[in-house]
Design a protein with these regions (language model features):
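Generic detector of leucine side chains in alpha-helical contexts
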Residues: 21, 46-47, 52, 75, ...
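Short, solvent-exposed beta-strand/turn "edge" segments of beta-rich domains on protein surfaces
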Residues: 18-21, 79, 98-99
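Intracellular C-terminal tails of type I single-pass membrane proteins
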Residues: 42-45, 58, 72, 110, ...
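Exposed beta-sheet edge and beta->alpha loop/turn motif
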Residues: 81-131
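Core segments of small alpha/beta cavity-forming domains
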Residues: 3-65
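A short linear-motif detector with a strong N-terminal bias
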Residues: 46, 51-55, 64-69, 87-91, ...
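Generic signature of intrinsically disordered, low-complexity segments enriched in small/polar residues
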Residues: 23, 31, 38, 69, ...
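A short, amphipathic edge element
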Residues: 60-79
Length: 131
């Protein structure tokens, strides 16, 4: 049963979180690869209009290439007004082709989705570089 009160914590079955993280990892890879190849419009359905605009204006460094997601975990899972929000910590590896180094990058990505929508996709709305 769904609680109508926004004050009660929502208990999410573990398999739902696993499924969400699998999708979030795929979205991360798709978004980063599209960004690095200056084709961010190809993944616009995975971004809020604000996130899309920010990524269109920013240019990815040519010497840094995405390698893999090493680890991901849900940091936050909340409801806010008519939205569901999940914050995911990504630990990833990128390759610096200029100096032949592997870089470890830690970022927190915020995904959102309208509560009462038939669209199963979550949209990226924020990125915070941790390290």
């Amino acid at each position: 049963k769904k609680s109508k009160s926004s004050f009660k914590p929502k208990i999410v079955p573990q398999n739902t979180n696993t499924e969400f993280l699998d999708g979030a990892n795929k979205a991360y890879e798709m978004i980063v690869q599209a960004y690095q190849s200056n084709n961010i419009e190809n993944v616009k359905d995975l971004l809020t209009p604000e996130a899309l605009n920010a990524m269109v204006q920013a240019k990815a460094p040519k010497e840094i290439k995405f390698s893999e997601v090493k680890n991901s975990s849900i940091l936050e899972d909340r409801e806010e007004d008519s939205r569901l929000i999940k914050s995911v910590k990504f630990e990833t590896e990128h390759y610096n082709v200029a100096n032949n180094e592997i870089l470890t990058v830690v970022e927190d990505w915020g995904f959102e989705k309208e509560k009462n929508t038939s669209d199963p996709n979550w949209k990226l709305f924020s990125i915070k570089l941790v390290s």
